[in-house]
């Protein structure tokens, strides 16, 4: 796998381009501000009544309605939620695309699942920082960057990959390393990771551990500390040095207990369920389910959100976090102005 760095990308490729960033949320604000600070000509495209309009203007950015921004631009980066991209594409982007334009995405969902099918006369690329937007911005301001993925779906002028690399450099990504992938692999691994490990698997593991201790007669506060609070300490060790760093850093008791009991939690049945989750990502089952859910007004999703909010661990956690003075600070998104 080739990793691209500073000398592999040329920002001059963007110097004479007009760049539209659609959206000013977590990723949108980082892309727009980093590219602007890298010397590029950037416009943010938003809905006319968007709450982000004033924020973008206060950040020193030119702001236009989405359709006008697309019409003006040579490169259009789509950084709005997956579920609204198709409608925005059909209403505001497609009618204003010009031959030779470059259409860019931060995630491959809508291209891979053919919710958006661009015309054959435009470049289609992806630049996906592997980090939340506030860290993309913060590391850039600090003179560094976060790793990025790039991909090319259509290359009409032979420059699509070079444009993607230049964009990644403008974000600061080439200081950390840029890896080339494709829309299929990025989309499917991203969705599987979210569902099986990061957002789905970890949340269910935490709740199951908490419930087991509480049902066993232990104080809910102790259950929270053991199954939720201390997880960050372990994840930080994974982040810094992998599984070996974690095993080296914990006690022998914890290491032995984890290695001998962990496989009894993640059983062959669990692994088979993971393979089924991956299959549903690969064959489009999940994508169709999610799109149908969005079109139905999020009825199931709202019920699931309510159930999560009402779980006992949430009330216990809120009380305990109120005792942790180091947590009394702004949300990272608020710090970043989004």
Curated annotation (Swiss-Prot):
Keywords: Amino-acid biosynthesis, Branched-chain amino acid biosynthesis, Magnesium, Metal-binding, NADP, Oxidoreductase. The active site is at 107. NADP(+) binds at residues 24-27, 47, 50, 52, 82-85, 133. One of its GO terms (biological process) is isoleucine biosynthetic process. PROSITE patterns: KARI_C, KARI_N. GO terms for molecular function: ketol-acid reductoisomerase activity; magnesium ion binding; NADP binding. SUPFAM superfamilies: 6-phosphogluconate dehydrogenase C-terminal domain-like, NAD(P)-binding Rossmann-fold domains. Mg(2+) 1 binds at residues 190, 194. Gene3D superfamilies: 6.10.240.10, NAD(P)-binding Rossmann-like Domain. Substrate binds at residue 251. InterPro entries: 6-PGluconate_DH-like_C_sf, KARI, KARI_C, KARI_N, KARI_prok, NAD(P)-bd_dom_sf. Residues 1-181 form the KARI N-terminal Rossmann domain. Residues 182-327 form the KARI C-terminal knotted domain. Mg(2+) 2 binds at residues 190, 226, 230. Pathway: Amino-acid biosynthesis; L-isoleucine biosynthesis; L-isoleucine from 2-oxobutanoate: step 2/4; Amino-acid biosynthesis; L-valine biosynthesis; L-valine from pyruvate: step 2/4. NCBIfam families: ilvC, PRK05479.1, PRK13403.1. This is Ketol-acid reductoisomerase (NADP(+)). It comes from Chloroherpeton thalassium (strain ATCC 35110 / GB-78).
């Amino acid at each position: 796998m080739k990793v691209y760095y500073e000398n592999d990308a040329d920002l001059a490729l963007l110097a004479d381009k007009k760049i539209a960033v659609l959206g000013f949320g977590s990723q949108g604000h980082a892309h727009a501000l980093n590219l602007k600070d890298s010397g590029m000509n950037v416009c943010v495209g938003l809905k006319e009544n968007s709450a982000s309009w004033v924020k973008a203007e206060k950040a020193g950015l030119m702001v236009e309605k989405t359709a006008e921004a697309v019409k003006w631009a040579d490169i259009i980066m789509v950084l709005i939620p997956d579920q609204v991209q198709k409608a925005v594409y059909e209403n505001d982007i497609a009618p204003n695309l010009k031959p030779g334009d470059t259409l860019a995405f931060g995630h491959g969902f809508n291209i891979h699942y053919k919710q958006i099918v661009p015309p054959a006369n435009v470049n289609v690329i992806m630049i996906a920082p592997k980090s939340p937007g506030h860290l993309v911005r913060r590391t850039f301001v600090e003179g560094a960057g976060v790793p990025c993925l790039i991909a090319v779906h259509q290359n009409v002028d032979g420059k699509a990959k070079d444009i993607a690399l230049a964009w990644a450099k403008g974000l600061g990504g080439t200081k950390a390393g840029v890896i080339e992938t494709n829309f299929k692999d990025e989309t499917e691994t991203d969705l599987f990771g979210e569902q099986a490990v990061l957002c789905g698997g970890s949340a269910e593991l935490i709740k199951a551990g908490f419930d087991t201790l509480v049902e066993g007669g232990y104080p809910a506060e102790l259950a929270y500390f053991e199954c939720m609070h201390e997880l960050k300490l372990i994840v930080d060790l994974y982040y810094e040095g992998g599984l070996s760093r974690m095993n080296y850093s914990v006690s022998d008791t914890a290491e032995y207990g984890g290695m001998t009991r962990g496989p009894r939690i993640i059983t062959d049945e669990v692994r088979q369920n993971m393979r089924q989750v991956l299959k549903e990502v690969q064959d489009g089952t999940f994508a169709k389910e999610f799109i149908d859910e969005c079109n139905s007004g999020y009825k199931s999703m709202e019920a699931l959100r309510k159930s999560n909010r009402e779980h006992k661990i949430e009330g216990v956690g809120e009380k305990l976090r109120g005792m942790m003075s180091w947590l009394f600070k702004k949300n990272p998104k608020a710090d970043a102005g989004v």
